[in-house]
Amino acid sequence: MDFYNPYLSKKPTDTKTPKLHTTRQSICRLVPKCFRNPTEKGVVSVSSFALPTYFFKGNENKVYLENGKSMWHLRRPCKNALLEEQSITFHIYDIVETTYSEDRCNDIPFKFQTDIIPNGTVLKLLGRTLEGASVCVNVFGQRNYFYVKVPEGGNITYLIKQALNEKFSPSCAYQTEAVKKKILSRYDPEEHDVFKVTVSSSLSVYKISDSLVSNGCEVFETNVDAIRRFVIDNDFSTFGWYTCKSACPRITNRDSHTDIEFDCGYYDLEFHADRTEWPPYNIMSFDIECIGEKGFPCAKNEGDLIIQISCVFWHAGALDTTRNMLLSLGTCSAVENTEVYEFPSEIDMLHGFFSLIRDFNVEIITGYNISNFDLPYLIDRATQIYNIKLSDYSRVKTGSIFQVHTPKDTGNGFMRSVSKIKISGIIAIDMYIVCKDKLSLSNYKLDTVANHCIGAKKEDVSYKDIMPLFMSGPEGRAKIGLYCVIDSVLVMKLLKFFMIHVEISEIAKLAKIPTRRVLTDGQQIRVFSCLLAAARAENYILPVSNDVNADGFQGATVINPIPGFYNNAVLVVDFASLYPSIIQAHNLCYSTLIPHHALHNYPHLKSSDYETFMLSSGPIHFVKKHIQASLLSRLLTVWLSKRKAIRQKLAECEDLDTKTILDKQQLAIKVTCNAVYGFTGVASGLLPCISIAETVTLQGRTMLEKSKIFIEAMTPDTLQEIVPHIVKHEPDAKFRVIYGDTDSLFVECVGYSVDTVVKFGDFLAAFTSEKLFNAPIKLESEKTFQCLLLLAKKRYIGILSNDKLLMKGVDLVRKTACKFVQNTSSKILNLILKDPEVKAAAQLLSTKDPDYAFREGLPDGFLKVIDILNESHKNLRTGQVPVEELTFSTELSRPISSYKTENLPHLTVYKKIITRHEEPPQVHDRIPYVFVGKTTSCISNMAEDPTYTVQNNIPIAVDLYFDKLIHGVANIIQCLFKDSSKTVSVLYNFVSTPVLFSYELLTDHSVKA
């Protein structure tokens, strides 16, 4: 396949352009030199007046048509709208808040013009009609508002006028109304005199409120936008079906890039909560391939081009049919099941891609790590290299945003920041973030995740092959193209596997926020919006938090584990929805809270009217339900009742699509319920109340301790009284709590068989709940272990009653371990958990002191473990272990000159490759290595390239690998000998190999397993 490249002529200095397709503004294009000479690297800069161009099936076409539309409008049906006012039914997936000013009056129907004088909020509802046409409905008349408590003698009108009269203040229409409201901050049943300040545009809210605060006023709900007012005040939703009874078609002065557009008032809308089906929303999975002139590509280097972009489309709810496209820089041979669009330069391809997002009716985009790489790279190339105005490529015109916000603070933990994709009218789902959140794997490469979830693999093309393939011509580019397309196909399959688009839409509906904010804006905004709605129903208003420097609190603690191997049944009981149930049972809320210093202000309250908790900061009180019902409790009760009803429907449902939606609905409720506690405990959150959060964790700790004492005191006779069937047991039967983890207790059941424990577990949990706790707090039997290796807090391995292996906090497939260590460690673990003789020996050892083995020797059963270690050493010594199983790999994360520490194994191998004049790895390549030769004081010097090792028959470092194995095994059986270092000593003492090597003797620990 070939085409005429208008930007490369015979003479490099000849920049003449064909007469057809010209524009007034010159465009600077970067064209790869290899298009002229396949062996030449780099780019040539060509200035041209030609409009962006593409080739499809050998025919040249313009990216943009004369009517301003793009090439993609030719490839979808045109939807015609009637000219007169009409009734329409449509589904929305996004709401965009914009502001119109009075100079836009001629663009809109006369009846809405007063809503934008001097300016006004316009909400753009984006979605699809019943017929499948994309639609934008511009909603007028929705006002934003907040509340103000004015100090005595203050004049609210004067203060607002003063704020608006200041220089650079935006013009704004406003209205004040005296109202009575309860304030949600502490127990206070009284209604207060406040002013409701309604403004025509949200642009003025902060300007006015800041001025009011500086004049001694107290403001409320200034952090609520017009979208949430629209949804909450009208009982609407951010995702679902609407009917507009009086929609005015907008034929001219269009303000969106949809098939059709209408104007209406918010009062013309009706929401259909009972309809859950989806229209055929267009989901696009994409991936980019780049080349770097000097290693890993950097978007701001002119020569580091994007060479291909794959786009895979799927209509939500359709069968597995997808449509594959490949945008290629330069000629490209055919790729199976893929439409190939060829572009003569990178800027042409970028115009093709961004116009595709805008004009191909794409509602959802997805990819793998697109928020950290693909989209930032695309945006930087477009804006920094070519000065493309990307705000022209979202789904709306006014208020358009097309950017990725990368926070400066990207730390870990609860408040960790993530890059946020912000494209107006586009829901962006980064499947890398989704997979990291939902899976627990040794790494989160697309290949690893796809293999784990859907049993699929990527095409085998390494990064270092991409440049040679690209330069080689159409066939090479087709190979890259297939690799690129398959990546997008895999991501689309992962999206379908998790059905994450349905999940986030259900969270958005429950939390009353736009769907595109679910993945990026955290849980604070979800709970805040729900609390806002609940507060409004009870005439409460919410204060604005400014307590950013408040101290934190002691989080959930555990009952320290008793490490060891347990060859008895271990019952795990846990509290169902622990934190939500504590809030419900103890009536905890802002509205029920009385600080200790304020208790004297409520002389009418008796001690029986409130519950007192002793926190680290002092006593705190919460009134009981008969005095004031907790708003948080009521919210949780409604949610949990709804979840119960949904799960009942789910059990009866047979339609797969409906089952998926119901499942995601109940999951959305579960996630949001569990977020309520965290919402109150974040000092820098939207409405923090550390006293509530600390009370919840205090109660959680107290409940664990109470349960421990109660269960351990339970005798076989007591158990028999509460169980309707005969409970068989040994004479010495007893219960011992060996670990408590936040909301779970691990109970060793001495003298009871596993089957017996499984049968009485529910009765024991229910009896404990009944005797100790108020409803709805409920202890449940979660699982039973046949045997358990309890290593430390949140680290254990066991065999469940159904014979399945369960591991928590223990990763046998470690990134820093080779397959030899992983496989042998797994073999030994399997022996300890399943071989009766080894199990008995392990149980004995875990009850003895660490030096028992040195005094008395190892039990006979445990010698099977030593036999495996001896056999492994023999295999290493005799060369029976394949080099592939001994290979490590580490990413070359940056140029070698940027490393401060050079004694790293992969850098040693890099230098050896350079010395041998072989092709060096590129930045972000993984460098494989093995350890060879005799042990030295600097382990990194022993690293060698695996291929070179095999070719030259270099002996591996037997003792180093065996030591890694010893440490790997010690890591998983350390509880038998009290700690890892003692376990290493015991193992070395009993293997038939002399102690020739140990990490403790060396100073270089850079590659420790």
From Swiss-Prot:
Disulfide feature: none
GO molecular function terms attached to this record: DNA binding; DNA-directed DNA polymerase activity; nucleotide binding
Keywords for this protein: DNA replication, DNA-binding, DNA-directed DNA polymerase, Host nucleus, Nucleotidyltransferase, Transferase, Viral DNA replication
Pfam families cross-referenced by the UniProt entry: DNA_pol_B (PF00136), DNA_pol_B_exo1 (PF03104)
EC supergroup of this enzyme: transferase
Main localization category: host cell
Reactions the enzyme catalyzes: DNA(n) + a 2'-deoxyribonucleoside 5'-triphosphate = DNA(n+1) + diphosphate
Gene3D superfamilies xref list: DNA polymerase family B, C-terminal domain, DNA Polymerase, chain B, domain 1, Helix hairpin bin, Palm domain of DNA polymerase, Ribonuclease H-like superfamily/Ribonuclease H
EC number(s) per entry: 2.7.7.7
Subcellular location: Host nucleus
Nucleotidyltransferase as UniProt keyword: yes
Family membership noted in the UniProt record: Belongs to the DNA polymerase type-B family.
Protein name (database record): DNA polymerase catalytic subunit
